[in-house]
Regions:
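Predominantly a Rossmann-like dinucleotide-binding segment in NAD(P)-dependent oxidoreductases
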Residues: 66-171, 287
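Beta-strand-loop-alpha-helix segment that lines the small-molecule cofactor/substrate pocket
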Residues: 9, 15-67, 82
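Short glycine-/small-residue-rich Rossmann-like dinucleotide-binding loops
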Residues: 6, 14-15, 195
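Contiguous beta-strand/loop segments that form the cofactor/metal-binding neighborhood of enzyme cores
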Residues: 127-222, 250-261
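Structural detector of well-ordered beta-strand residues that form the stable sheet scaffold
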Residues: 34, 59-61, 91, 142, ...
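Short, Asp-centered acidic motifs that coordinate Mg2+ and/or phosphate
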Residues: 8-9, 89
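C-terminal helix-rich "cap/oligomerization" subdomain common to oxidoreductases
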Residues: 9-12, 47, 51, 55-58, ...
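A structured beta-alpha segment of the ubiquitous adenosine-cofactor-binding alpha/beta core
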Residues: 1-7
Length: 293
């Protein structure tokens, strides 16, 4: 594939541990790359991918598909137009009752995946927050990652398992739950995520809280706007056409190759998410707040 001059673009949809190698090899072979999220297992690996992109000048976009989600882009317009006022706090919840994927397999092996709930699900939520809030500069990060419910693999009770079935002779050494707080030059961002928890309800949403209004986005669905007007509280759901955001992403990738237009999913834009996730893991391991320069 890399030696074929007719191949202009490569889509990398492999396990996380080979994202950097394949993407870098493709870039150096003169191919444009759309690499699935997360960019890599670590911030260091993501930086190496970015370095090679700069050297080659080819496209390197990361599969943060929500940047092509019509619901997310409408929320961004609300915020950019000042409809919510000053956004002072954003909270992301990505918690499931029992949703550890492929217990004992690639998803739960740190050497392959790089992490668990944070790097698999949290990457989407953090990316949405940063995108909608205008990519504010990050100052400090604190967090804690837990490996609790899945470590006793044979004792882990579940009703369904995506990417299954379980491999009880495999490895489980990643986070199944995570909490964090990120201070930026814009809003404070808090997060609580879990592949698995001993609470029955799934809670997958993002709350944007401003001094003029607020928005709750139900992940993958629509959103509700909360505000006040003429002394009365208001609450409404915008109605709009939702296109397939995966198709939007692919169409935009092809278009940027043709036009040279830099997309919101370019490695330069989204690498901050890799840095934040790395800082949460570092904070958890070192039991201290991490300052980002």
């Amino acid at each position: 594939v890399l030696a074929d001059p007719e191949v202009e673009a490569v889509s990398v949809c492999t396990p996380n541990n080979v994202h950097p190698t394949i993407s870098i090899d493709a870039l150096r072979a003169g191919k444009n790359v759309l690499c699935e999220k997360p960019a890599a297992r670590t911030y260091k690996e993501a930086l190496e991918m970015q370095k090679v992109q700069h050297e080659t000048g080819k496209v390197l976009n990361i599969g943060v598909v929500n940047r092509f989600n019509d619901s997310v882009n409408l929320i961004k317009k609300y915020i950019d137009d000042g409809k919510l006022g000053n956004i002072y706090h954003v909270h992301a919840s990505f918690r499931a009752h029992r949703s550890i994927p492929g217990l004992g397999g690639a998803f739960t092996t740190k050497a392959i995946a790089g992490g668990g709930a944070l790097i698999d699900w949290g990457v989407h939520y953090l990316d949405i927050v940063m995108y909608c809030c205008g990519d504010p500069k990050v100052k400090t990060v604190t967090g804690e990652a837990f490996c609790e419910l899945g470590k006793d693999m044979k004792g882990y009770a579940y009703t369904d398992m995506w990417a299954g079935p379980p491999k009880y002779d495999g490895t489980y050494d990643v986070d199944d739950s995570v909490v964090g707080m990120i201070r930026t030059e814009g809003p404070v961002i808090s997060l609580h995520g879990a592949w698995a928890q001993n609470i029955g309800e799934n809670e997958c949403y993002i709350d944007f809280m401003g001094d003029k209004g607020g928005i709750r986005l139900q992940y993958g669905k629509d959103f509700t706007v909360y505000s006040s007007e003429y002394g009365a509280l208001t609450e409404y759901k915008p109605v709009f056409k939702m296109r397939d955001h995966f198709q939007n992403e692919i169409d935009a990738f092809i278009d940027c190759i043709k036009t040279g237009k830099k997309l919101p999913s370019h490695i330069d834009t989204v690498i901050i998410t890799a840095q934040m996730m790395q800082a949460i893991y570092d904070s958890s391991e070192q039991h201290k707040e991490i300052t980002l320069g």
